[in-house]
Amino acid sequence: MTGAVTSAYWLAAVAFLIGVGITAALYAKLEGSRARTRLAALAVIPGFAGLSYVGMALGIGTVTVNGAELVGLRYVDWVVTTPLLVGFIGYNAGASRRAIAGVMIADALMIVFGAAAVVSGGTLKWALFGVSALFHVSLFAYLYVIFPGGIPDDPMQRGLFSLLKNHVGLLWLAYPFVWLMGPAGIGFTGAVGAALTYAFLDVLAKVPYVYFFYARRQAFIDVTDSRAAAKGDGPAVGGEAPVATGDDAPTAAD
């Protein structure tokens, strides 16, 4: 691993850890808000990614198999954090548990087959990459076909769903091309270029999630409220819906 690659990993780790710090600040600001526990759960995404990049910078989990270098912690990070990203999108869309589990499993299998392709050669490499690509396509089917059909007719929920869906969907179009062009594929770009690109994409895909959730927190709270109403739980007091106050109240940014 070259010095430039190590530097790229450290820079990504710092970016993710800053993201965790921002999450902590937002968590404190949302004291008393029903959105607080959701924000804490979202912190797992930049937090786990940051720890993974620290390990990658230290060379932990990087092995050579059949002459190919596998950055193991990169794939461990992806198999943990990216299913959470798409699962959260499904939850925001009001999707069923089965659909959310389906998109998360498809995401994890995409990562697993991609990792297997890295350490394979010849026809097997491209066959495994093809299987990974099929799972990648299935993710877009969930994001752009299945999930949109079940979103409540609420502008805030639809707006947040569209933001998250397009943020992840557009960024993830780049990943298979980086893989193809990099050392794992045809080798058009080197390890340094691939490492820099992956680090940039990872940070851009994950850290802003906390901000998106905070900026449109009222829409996410509405998801919880609408589900409670659908189950017949209804308002808790006097037949009136709870009134959002303090940091839960809608703002111009919402």
From Swiss-Prot:
<keyword id="KW-0600">Photoreceptor protein</keyword>
<feature type="transmembrane region" description="Helical; Name=Helix E">
    <location>
        <begin position="124"/>
        <end position="151"/>
    </location>
</feature>
<dbReference type="InterPro" id="IPR001425">
    <property type="entry name" value="Arc/bac/fun_rhodopsins"/>
</dbReference>
<keyword id="KW-1003">Cell membrane</keyword>
<keyword id="KW-0472">Membrane</keyword>
<feature type="topological domain" description="Cytoplasmic">
    <location>
        <begin position="94"/>
        <end position="96"/>
    </location>
</feature>
<dbReference type="GO" id="GO:0005216">
    <property type="term" value="F:monoatomic ion channel activity"/>
</dbReference>
<dbReference type="GO" id="GO:0009881">
    <property type="term" value="F:photoreceptor activity"/>
</dbReference>
<feature type="topological domain" description="Extracellular">
    <location>
        <begin position="1"/>
        <end position="4"/>
    </location>
</feature>
<feature type="topological domain" description="Extracellular">
    <location>
        <begin position="183"/>
        <end position="190"/>
    </location>
</feature>
<feature type="topological domain" description="Cytoplasmic">
    <location>
        <begin position="224"/>
        <end position="254"/>
    </location>
</feature>
<comment type="similarity">
    <text>Belongs to the archaeal/bacterial/fungal opsin family.</text>
</comment>
<feature type="transmembrane region" description="Helical; Name=Helix A">
    <location>
        <begin position="5"/>
        <end position="26"/>
    </location>
</feature>
<feature type="region of interest" description="Disordered">
    <location>
        <begin position="231"/>
        <end position="254"/>
    </location>
</feature>
<feature type="transmembrane region" description="Helical; Name=Helix D">
    <location>
        <begin position="97"/>
        <end position="119"/>
    </location>
</feature>
<feature type="modified residue" description="N6-(retinylidene)lysine">
    <location>
        <position position="206"/>
    </location>
</feature>
<feature type="topological domain" description="Cytoplasmic">
    <location>
        <begin position="27"/>
        <end position="35"/>
    </location>
</feature>
<keyword id="KW-0157">Chromophore</keyword>
<comment type="function">
    <text>Involved in the control of phototaxis.</text>
</comment>
<keyword id="KW-1133">Transmembrane helix</keyword>
<keyword id="KW-0812">Transmembrane</keyword>
<feature type="transmembrane region" description="Helical; Name=Helix C">
    <location>
        <begin position="72"/>
        <end position="93"/>
    </location>
</feature>
<keyword id="KW-0716">Sensory transduction</keyword>
<dbReference type="GO" id="GO:0005886">
    <property type="term" value="C:plasma membrane"/>
</dbReference>
<dbReference type="GO" id="GO:0007602">
    <property type="term" value="P:phototransduction"/>
</dbReference>
<feature type="topological domain" description="Cytoplasmic">
    <location>
        <begin position="152"/>
        <end position="154"/>
    </location>
</feature>
<protein>
    <recommendedName>
        <fullName>Sensory rhodopsin</fullName>
    </recommendedName>
</protein>
<dbReference type="InterPro" id="IPR018229">
    <property type="entry name" value="Rhodopsin_retinal_BS"/>
</dbReference>
<feature type="topological domain" description="Extracellular">
    <location>
        <begin position="58"/>
        <end position="71"/>
    </location>
</feature>
<keyword id="KW-0675">Receptor</keyword>
<feature type="transmembrane region" description="Helical; Name=Helix G">
    <location>
        <begin position="191"/>
        <end position="223"/>
    </location>
</feature>
<feature type="transmembrane region" description="Helical; Name=Helix F">
    <location>
        <begin position="155"/>
        <end position="182"/>
    </location>
</feature>
<feature type="transmembrane region" description="Helical; Name=Helix B">
    <location>
        <begin position="36"/>
        <end position="57"/>
    </location>
</feature>
<dbReference type="Pfam" id="PF01036">
    <property type="entry name" value="Bac_rhodopsin"/>
</dbReference>
<feature type="topological domain" description="Extracellular">
    <location>
        <begin position="120"/>
        <end position="123"/>
    </location>
</feature>
<keyword id="KW-0681">Retinal protein</keyword>
